[in-house]
Amino acid sequence: MKKYNLISAQTRIFESPLKERPFKVAIEKKAAEINLVNLRDYAIDSYGTIDGKPFGGGVGMILRPEPIYSALLDLYGSDEKILDTKVSSTKKIVVLDPAGPKWNQNKAKEYSKLEEITFICGRYEGIDQRVVDLFASETVSLGEFVASGGELPALVILETILRLDENVLEKPEATELESYSNDSTTEHPQYTRPEEFKNLLVPKVLLSGDHKKIKEWKKSNSK
């Protein structure tokens, strides 16, 4: 069973999506264990403090390193095991960061082979850089934009990983035909009934029954 840990200051964001496919299927089929780790449980004081003002000035608050470190200690048991995980070939500690390398299908395939991944989700104005420097195997971004936190990007990334598990999708072979599955192209346009909609027709070749021509059409219309 693969293991995924989601460290966040807003774990409730995950609760509803995890009740839906493919997360629900992965959990029910014991293909994955998904743990929600609430940073508030590791606050530095009785007021629930997990953030602080940025040194040097700036707008907003930064997640402090101590709560994240305490959460990692709880997950792995010791500094040594945290560092072992950081450099492991079968496990990763990943920080969601808009400045990180962009996520893609090849990375999804790579991550789908790992035994355990811990995602550290930023919130507010970000995470103290020392968390990245000390504990992160790598940083990951969904693209050149900024979200309010790393929770939704983490869900997107986790979904791309889980749906590559043959135990999760009803038709695992479908992933071999999807966009970016075997190369850098996107899938061809898709059509269903009715054959005509607002004067637009389904391409005749798709209705022809000629499998060779259909295959050629699909290939030539992939981008």
Protein language model annotation of sequence segments:
Residues M1, L83, Q190-K223:
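SAM-dependent methyltransferases
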Residues M1-Y76, K212-I214, K219-N221:
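N-terminal nucleotide/polyanion-binding subdomain common to many enzyme families
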Residues N5-I7, N35-V37, V94, I117-T118, ...:
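Hydrophobic/aromatic beta-strand patches that form the interior of the parallel beta-sheet core
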Residues R21-V25, K109-K113, L134-F135:
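Short, solvent-exposed amphipathic alpha-helical segments in soluble enzyme
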Residues R40-D45, P101, V146-G149:
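A short acidic, often aromatic-flanked loop/helix-cap motif at beta-alpha or helix-coil junctions
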Residues I62-C121:
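S-adenosyl-L-methionine/SAH cofactor-binding core of RNA-modifying enzymes
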Residues V131-E170, Y180:
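Structured adenosyl-cofactor binding patch, chiefly the S-adenosyl-L-methionine
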Residues L152, L164-K204:
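Internal, active-site/partner-interface "lid" segment
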